[in-house]
Amino acid sequence: MSAFFSIILGMKYEKIIVGKFIDRPNRFVAEVEIDAAGAEPHMWETEHQRKMINRKSGSEKAGQIAFVHVKNTGRCRELLVPGATVWLEDFTDRMGTRKLAYSLIGIEKQTENGILKINMDSQAPNKVVREALESGKIKLEGMGKLTVIQPEKTCGNSRFDLYIEDEEGRKGYIEVKGVTLEERGTAYFPDAPTERGVKHIRELIEVCRNGMGAWLIFVVQMRNVLKMKPNDVTHRAFGDILRRAAEEGVHVHAFSCKVTEESLEICEEIPVDLT
């Protein structure tokens, strides 16, 4: 695989509050215990509901309980465990049309080597990759200076994350995947079967066959990972089509990230193991 140029990029979050994960009643909402000092009273449930949730959390002296928006619809079962420390972006002073005042954007995972900070914001990978392309800090194989960077562009039966053109008129499509699953220093994707992901890779193969450039970029939303692998145990079909895509000319790359409560920063490329 051809290499990217070295890059340092990042995005920032505003007004972060730390809490403890309790439960996830559905894909979009979590129950989190946070410091009452950082919360607006109108966001809390009734006293009875609060006591019931506090019993569920196992806390004798629990803080306030809030329902928060989860910015990742993946399973994340190995991350979202009761008692885990989570980071919330606070929107209480900029609600707009929001129904929930907080968004869960990150979590701390206990590993054999200590605490691993993981960004869970599924919108963040696209943003940092697009920013890198716009600034010229990422230079893609076979492409010159980019003159068009268009998000959410349709090609065939799929809508890719980014469509690009360079000054010579060369065209290409980029699909970005955020990665939050880690086991013993290896990042895996996906964490759940993804027929949509398989379809996107098939379309990237067609892009190559039609003479355009195609890139699949995995943004591993954590640091201290050694490599990235397709999760064949969870979805063998995704791994098979990914290996086929690499053989047919789709450029496949993965980057680890420096993660803090307030930021996500792409820091270095890591190997993609397709064996």
Question: Where are the regions that the model predicts?
Answer:
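Short, positively charged and aromatic/hydrophobic N-terminal segments
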Residues: S6-I8
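Conserved catalytic cores of phosphodiester-cleaving nucleases, focusing on short active-site segments
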Residues: G19, F160-D191, L204
